[in-house]
A protein has these predicted regions:
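Hydrophobic faces of well-ordered beta-strands that scaffold small-molecule active sites
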Residues: 19-23, 48-50, 75-77, 92-94, ...
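Alpha-helix-loop-beta-strand connector modules within alpha/beta enzyme cores
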Residues: 60-83, 113-125, 182-208, 238-239
Length: 239
């Protein structure tokens, strides 16, 4: 039974914040896999996201399979394209890149994914995906050939997020990008959170417990940590 989205909404209603660890299959150190698993198990993470911008479907499937065997947390696909699917995952963030105007990432990749998704028992969670300027060009920007929303364009971020909600997005994701120089601005998180009714995800450029807490305090319901954990698997050790 598909229950993840219902749980996310219930947590939002009850003010329960959630932390997700994003794992990129291309960047996993398999020689240190056991220690990575232990680090995740001892972290405050509630979710595992699997994805990135450029890797193969086989790498995604391999990582999801290993995670499901080792860790008792929901594993959610965060696909960079229509081929990055894995039957063993619990759910998929069905992303539409609303901040850009490239039709391939607004709708074409989604259409291409449908035949495979119809054969899988995945919980499909429509997600309005907004790329926010982070101080340098990110892989998402390069691959999607789109420009991010500027850091001072708070109204544009708010209106884009709300448009996504009106169109049916069940989640809104504000993304600074992998290895971002700067995280999503606090005033932007706050403004978007105050405008939408669906759960808000914030990720990219968050490298300390203080920054994570600031994002939560500004209204993020789910915060995603990727590069910080990737570079230091003991990132959560002092929490």
């Amino acid at each position: 039974m598909h229950q993840l989205y219902a749980q996310l909404c219930l947590n939002k209603a009850n003010g329960i914040k959630q932390l997700a660890i994003l794992l990129d299959p291309e960047k996993i150190n398999w020689e240190a896999w056991e220690s990575t698993v232990q680090a995740i198990q001892h972290s405050p993470a509630n979710l595992i996201l699997v994805g990135g911008s450029s890797h193969s479907p086989l790498a995604v499937t391999q990582l999801v399979q290993k995670l499901k065997k080792a860790i008792d947390l929901p594993v959610v696909l965060f696909p960079g394209n229509s081929a990055q699917l894995a039957a063993q995952a619990d759910a998929i963030l069905f992303l539409s890149l609303l901040s850009g105007r490239n039709p391939d990432y607004l709708i074409q990749q989604q259409v291409d994914a449908v035949p495979a998704l119809m054969q899988l028992d995945l919980e499909v969670i429509s997600t309005g995906y907004l790329l926010i300027d982070s101080g340098h060009v990110t892989s998402v920007e390069r691959i999607s050939q789109t420009k991010p929303i500027a850091r001072n364009q708070v109204d544009l971020a708010v209106h884009t997020a709300k448009a996504g909600e009106y169109l049916g997005s069940k989640l809104v994701y504000l993304e600074a990008g992998s290895g971002a120089q700067f995280p999503v601005p606090i005033d932007m998180i706050q403004a978007v959170s105050n405008t939408i009714a669906v759960p808000l995800i914030v990720g990219g450029g968050l490298r300390s417990q203080r920054e994570i807490q600031a994002a939560f305090d500004a209204g993020a319901d789910i915060v995603v940590i990727g590069t910080a954990f990737e570079e230091d698997p003991q990132f959560f050790a002092s929490w």
